[in-house]
Amino acid sequence: MAAGPYSIDVNETDFTERVLAASAHTPVLVDFWADWCPPCRVLTPVLERLADEYAGGFVLAKIEADENMKLAGRYKLRGFPTAILFVKGEPVDQFSGARAPDYVREFLDRHLDK
């Protein structure tokens, strides 16, 4: 999937640097998605638009789950899409399934400094 100015594509190789270490400075919302998953095709554009709207308030890290099964297993994902917010190297909250922009905005606002 294409990455915008506030979103990146991440894999098992660069996860530690681009998610865990980077979240020490800026929260990172990880979007675990899969090509075969219709709800993923609904949620990812919502997350990309919000990443642009928040203009650096968080980084969106997109991870294709089928290609990165070790990461999906590490976080015990049970379905897709699943979004996990990392702050200071730790997962602080998550949600699963396609969600409306207002739901995701409220989720983010609970954890981000405004």
Outline where the language-model segments fall.
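Conserved residues in the N-terminal Rossmann fold of short-chain dehydrogenase/reductase
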Residues: 62
